Swiss-Prot record:
GO BP terms in the entry: carbohydrate metabolic process
Name of the protein described by the UniProt record: Myrosinase 1
pH dependence: Optimum pH is 5.5 with sinigrin as substrate.
Family of this protein: Belongs to the glycosyl hydrolase 1 family.
Catalytic activity: a thioglucoside + H2O = a sugar + a thiol
Residues where substrate binds: Q19, H122, N166
PROSITE patterns in the cross-refs: GLYCOSYL_HYDROL_F1_2
InterPro entries from the UniProt entry: Glyco_hydro_1, Glyco_hydro_1_N_CS, Glycoside_hydrolase_SF
Organism name: Brevicoryne brassicae
PANTHER family: GLYCOSYL HYDROLASE (PTHR10353), LP05116P (PTHR10353:SF36)
Gene Ontology terms for molecular function: beta-glucosidase activity; metal ion binding; thioglucosidase activity
Family matches, as Gene3D superfamilies: Glycosidases (3.20.20.80)
Amino acid sequence: MDYKFPKDFMFGTSTASYQIEGGWNEDGKGENIWDRLVHTSPEVIKDGTNGDIACDSYHKYKEDVAIIKDLNLKFYRFSISWARIAPSGVMNSLEPKGIAYYNNLINELIKNDIIPLVTMYHWDLPQYLQDLGGWVNPIMSDYFKEYARVLFTYFGDRVKWWITFNEPIAVCKGYSIKAYAPNLNLKTTGHYLAGHTQLIAHGKAYRLYEEMFKPTQNGKISISISGVFFMPKNAESDDDIETAERANQFERGWFGHPVYKGDYPPIMKKWVDQKSKEEGLPWSKLPKFTKDEIKLLKGTADFYALNHYSSRLVTFGSDPNPNFNPDASYVTSVDEAWLKPNETPYIIPVPEGLRKLLIWLKNEYGNPQLLITENGYGDDGQLDDFEKISYLKNYLNATLQAMYEDKCNVIGYTVWSLLDNFEWFYGYSIHFGLVKIDFNDPQRTRTKRESYTYFKNVVSTGKP
């Protein structure tokens, strides 16, 4: 196989505001749900750390842009901190210094011929809005719409690529299994309500842009949908094949189906309705869209934005320790062949899973333009990060195979991440960066890893 990425293929890298910026209470920034969580419950973070300073990108953004420029990347995906723009999250009180920070970052990128790709929401809800109920409160979709309006107004003349939500399924986990902020345990219904509100919010932001801003700004909008890819444990078993399809619909059809087809996947509605009845509930745990909401949502992705890291095998059953959603009735496992002896890495590399996922998405949604908005490997932080290089090489080759052999319409690839950063409940114990950050140094010194050199070469040659 000697495939090569086309000349117009978009290579980029990705970060998120809470994970890299620091400056948690500087220049009028308000408190968000991660600030509140790490300050009141530091024990939930593996190493007891927080994102108060993180990579200090609030002060060192020019250094970050210089690194991106050196990599010759086409774009940089970063997220905006809602509470930096509007401290309470309500748009009647904006913070000019927060707006200035993002204007400076965007202008610095453009000055260096780097396209800004902006994520509006990467998990850091202003605490005041959480006090109102957060994403389980339907009113949040209107707050988000007004937040989006401000972003389009202030930045849309230069930003032409937007992501409304990063991995909405992860936000849902924060309401049901205490895996992310706000760290709530609203089992059975919390995650479905949070997902529903995010979808409506996405639809409202998309339609607002379409009607008010797209005619002059001419940008694109999507939503980054994540998840492992599920494959049948026994490829000969009809039960396992059916279970894998159901698991994939619960994992990513949950958000992809409404955005492309207007409603939740039929199999998801059927199973949640049935489980709700079995639990003696008077209605389904999965909210229903109105006809107007179906119309609002259908066709609200200008490209498919995919975050993907790993895959799992599934078989039918009730998992005694369900990772997240017991309503889907599947048990996950890994193929021993995926692992090295005596090793269970944080990310289990299954590159063929990405290829199969790209084919699945092509068949499911009519082969849309697809941008991989996150893919990467976390390790112990060594500079000679050859495991990360191996992971990237294999996943890039799987992407090429999907493009050339399966005719999947992949337009770009984003490596997670540019920098080591605050990896949520793992703190600083896992390192995804092409660039190492010394978190013990007040200067947060940046040092390029072997994977940096590797990825720079891929970008320049088009070959993994």
